[in-house]
């Protein structure tokens, strides 16, 4: 090789290598000091793009986890509030159960109702004040609320919390048929009991025999209540139209085929002769006699079989119908209509021409006065449904005139046939009580008025035409049947809250599972980003040592390259 002075190639090569080593050393020091393999786009352009995408995904997943935890906090707040509401409903049902026995007086029942009213107020207070970050949770407005729980848009979970005010829960369906006066065989079917299928009950005979009647039908319905969601009660009761008046039964007087015979009884049955005679055979007839607070005779079927009177119980007893199979009441806890079909439905007062009282009652509605329509649907009344009116002295005026002791005597100017003109009652609803022609204008007869002296028939002023119809009932548990109804309504309310809580619980579990999943995903994404972005200290330390040594050796090489030019001077000596 020749000796040159102008261009020191060896020195230039040494410098170039030193520059490379210097950059490698700077990069290595930058990585070791930052802990990152990629400190700028120049370090790894494609790797940086992937790492940035992974970092964005990991950060978004972190916020999604926070969103999920916020959602859990909201749902847990609502859940705990409803847990307290359930305790209140349990107390309401307990107090209603306490009121549902005739050992309670009106005074004590009123006190229990006052307690229930306060409990309902607190239940509504919880519903109206439970909130999270200013959002009401239990008032019905928290519907289809979305929570972003993914790294991409529209990866959401929806949550809804139903309203829990007393006006929104406990809605219970009550349906009560008309009073039945005919026997038969009933084949009852519940239509679409589960939204799809029909449910057919076993046929039940409606008669006066043991093991038949509305009691047997109610037992069959209640036996399947867990499947259909429908429960039944019955009220087979014949109540006198007025306080017992002196009279007597016929020699062949019988109830449900059991002959009782002739019984003389006084006003109000003061000596108890009529009631005692009927109760003497109650184990055989299934019918028990008593007097109500107004002194009226009450015949009650204990097991739900019909009540059939043959012979004559006498006008003084005030019993309108010699054959009575009672009223059937149905209760459904979800507030929807009870759709029925079948055969022989007129025997249970639910035929095509029968007036069926229907109502859906919420928890709050049970707090105040129960309307006549609601009371009748709940089965408060033993009479015909729909509030129809009827003549109370007999099934018709003609029938009344035909009975002994009616006050109509020969020569009075009233014949049995003339009574047909009064055998229809005109009101908001019309009920025919016997075959009728028209209302005669000859005799002025009005509800509760009797005949006036001016009519020329003052000797018959004892005749009355009255009404028997549904009427308003006092609030809640202040009556026995009201207490029973509040028990049903409270049970429905408990079921409603349990359904809402169950839905909340399902969403909580869904969110928890999602949080667990995206937490694992976030860890894996961060791990993948770390593999790309973070420095491997072991490897980079080796690179640093290499670059450091090369930098030192490069400096030495440059020094040697520069000193090698001195050899040219020796040639010139």
Curated annotation (Swiss-Prot):
Superkingdom per UniProt: Bacteria
Q: Which SUPFAM superfamilies match?
A: Phase 1 flagellin
Q: GO cellular component annotations, sorted alphabetically?
A: bacterial-type flagellum; extracellular region
- Its main localization is secreted
Instruction: Give the keywords, sorted.
Output: Bacterial flagellum, Secreted
* Keyword Secreted belongs to the record: yes
Query: What InterPro entries does the annotation carry?
Result: Flagellin, Flagellin_C, Flagellin_C_sub2, Flagellin_hook_IN_motif, Flagellin_N
Which positions carry the signal peptide feature in this UniProt record?
none
- Report the subcellular localization: Secreted; Bacterial flagellum
Any Pfam family matching the protein: Flagellin_C
Q: Which GO terms describe its molecular function?
A: structural molecule activity
Please give the function described in this protein's UniProt entry. Flagellin is the subunit protein which polymerizes to form the filaments of bacterial flagella.
Q: How does it assemble?
A: Heteromer of FlaA and FlaB. A flagellar filament composed exclusively of FlaA is indistinguishable in length from that of the wild-type and shows a slight reduction in motility. The flagellar filament composed exclusively of the FlaB is severely truncated in length and greatly reduced in motility. Thus, while both flagellins are not necessary for motility, both are required for a fully active flagellar filament.
Assigned protein family: Belongs to the bacterial flagellin family.
Q: Which named protein is this? A: Flagellin A
Where does this protein come from, organism-wise? Campylobacter coli
- Which gene carries the instructions for this protein? flaA
């Amino acid at each position: 090789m020749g000796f040159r002075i102008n261009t020191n190639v060896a020195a230039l090569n040494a410098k170039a290598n030193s520059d490379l080593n210097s950059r490698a050393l700077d990069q290595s020091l930058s990585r070791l000091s930052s802990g990152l393999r990629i400190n700028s786009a120049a370090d790894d352009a494609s790797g940086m793009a992937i790492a940035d995408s992974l970092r964005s995904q990991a950060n978004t997943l972190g916020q999604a986890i926070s969103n999920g935890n916020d959602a859990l906090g909201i749902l847990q707040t609502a859940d705990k509030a409803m847990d307290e509401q359930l305790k209140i409903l349990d107390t309401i049902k307990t107090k209603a159960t306490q009121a549902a026995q005739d050992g309670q007086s009106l005074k004590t029942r009123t006190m229990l109702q006052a307690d229930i009213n306060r409990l309902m107020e607190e239940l509504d207070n919880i519903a109206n004040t439970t909130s999270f970050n200013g959002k009401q949770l239990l008032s019905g407005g928290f519907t289809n609320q979305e929570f972003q729980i993914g790294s991409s848009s529209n990866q959401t979970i929806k949550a809804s919390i139903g309203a829990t005010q007393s006006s929104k829960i406990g809605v219970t369906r009550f349906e009560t048929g008309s009073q039945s006066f005919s026997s038969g065989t009933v084949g009852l079917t519940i239509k679409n009991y589960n939204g799809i299928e029909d449910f057919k009950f076993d046929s039940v005979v409606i008669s006066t025999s043991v093991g038949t009647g509305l009691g047997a039908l109610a037992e069959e319905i209640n036996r399947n209540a867990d499947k259909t969601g429908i429960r039944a009660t019955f009220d087979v009761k014949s109540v006198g139209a007025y306080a017992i008046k002196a009279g007597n039964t016929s020699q062949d007087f019988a109830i449900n085929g059991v002959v009782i015979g002739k019984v003389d009884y006084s006003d109000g049955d003061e000596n108890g002769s009529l009631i005692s005679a009927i109760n003497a055979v109650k184990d055989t007839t299934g019918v028990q006699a008593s007097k109500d607070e107004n002194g009226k005779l009450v015949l009650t079927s204990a097991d739900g079989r019909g009540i059939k009177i043959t012979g004559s119980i006498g006008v003084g007893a005030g019993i309108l119908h010699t054959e009575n199979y009672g009223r059937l009441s149905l209760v459904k806890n979800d507030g929807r209509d009870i759709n029925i079909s079948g055969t022989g439905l007129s025997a249970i007062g639910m035929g095509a021409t029968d007036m069926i009282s229907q109502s859906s009652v919420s928890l709050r509605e049970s707090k105040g006065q129960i309307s006549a329509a609601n009371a009748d649907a709940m089965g408060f009344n033993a009479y015909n449904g729909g509030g129809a009116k009827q003549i109370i002295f007999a099934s018709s005026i003609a029938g009344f005139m035909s009975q002994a002791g009616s006050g109509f005597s020969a020569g009075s100017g009233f014949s049995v046939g003339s009574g047909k003109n009064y055998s229809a009652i005109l009101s908001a609803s019309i009920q025919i009580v016997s075959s009728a022609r028209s209302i005669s204008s000859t005799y002025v007869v009005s509800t509760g008025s009797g005949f006036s002296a001016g009519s020329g028939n003052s000797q018959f002023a004892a005749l009355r035409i009255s009404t028997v119809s549904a009427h308003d009932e006092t609030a809640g548990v202040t009556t026995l049947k009201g207490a029973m109804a509040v028990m049903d309504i409270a049970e429905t309310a408990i079921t409603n809250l349990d359904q809402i809580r169950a839905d909340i619980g399902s969403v909580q579990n869904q969110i928890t599972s999602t949080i667990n999943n995206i937490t694992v995903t976030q860890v894996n994404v961060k791990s993948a980003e770390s593999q790309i972005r973070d420095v491997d200290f072991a490897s980079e330390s080796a690179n640093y040592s290499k670059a450091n040594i090369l930098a030192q050796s490069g400096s030495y090489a440059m020094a040697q390259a520069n000193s090698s030019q001195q050899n040219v001077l020796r040639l010139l000596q």
